[in-house]
């Protein structure tokens, strides 16, 4: 029997907010959203703010997410971050396959699948993004592009992993 999923609202702050600005924002969110129970609330600040935001939301209904993660656990991967590192900040969710990373960093569905498997191996929850470009939409390719991304990004996941994956 399929279990009913709780709705989730996730905010990706992208490359916005200094640590001080992130703390101001999350303190305001804590006050405004304190009574919200029917949805899971996730904030995904820049990596530089993860530590402080993690501390600021400890006693709240807000959960922490990361904007990306390496498929590797350790090694000479300059500028990357591993799941074990994210867990030190109490990160619970990781955004994967965002359109900007697909476009500018040329991330493939195969790479996103590897990242999703690494996220699951760390007992975190992946938020796998899919989406077509404007030219693909205007060219009538939306459904094909989305199907290809979904299939390619999730093809190696188990049923249990799929149930923990947000698309």
Tell where the protein language model's regions lie, with residue ranges:
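Active-site loop-to-helix "anion-binding N-cap" substructures in soluble metabolic enzymes
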Residues: 1-167
């Amino acid at each position: 029997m399929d279990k009913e999923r709780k709705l989730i609202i996730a905010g990706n702050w992208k490359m916005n907010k200094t640590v001080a600005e992130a703390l101001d924002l999350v303190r305001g969110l804590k006050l405004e959203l304190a009574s919200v129970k029917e949805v899971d609330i996730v904030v995904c600040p820049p990596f530089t703010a993860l530590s402080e935001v993690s501390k600021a939301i400890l006693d709240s209904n807000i959960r922490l997410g990361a904007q990306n993660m390496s498929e590797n656990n350790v090694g000479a991967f300059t500028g990357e971050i591993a799941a074990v590192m994210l867990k030190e900040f109490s990160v619970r969710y990781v955004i994967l396959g965002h359109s900007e990373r697909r476009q500018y960093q040329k991330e493939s569905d195969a790479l996103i699948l590897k990242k999703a498997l690494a996220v699951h191996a760390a007992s975190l929850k992946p938020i796998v993004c899919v989406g077509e470009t404007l030219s693909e939409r205007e060219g009538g390719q939306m459904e094909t592009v989305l199907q290809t991304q979904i299939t390619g990004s999730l093809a190696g996941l188990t049923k249990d992993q799929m149930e923990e994956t947000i698309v």
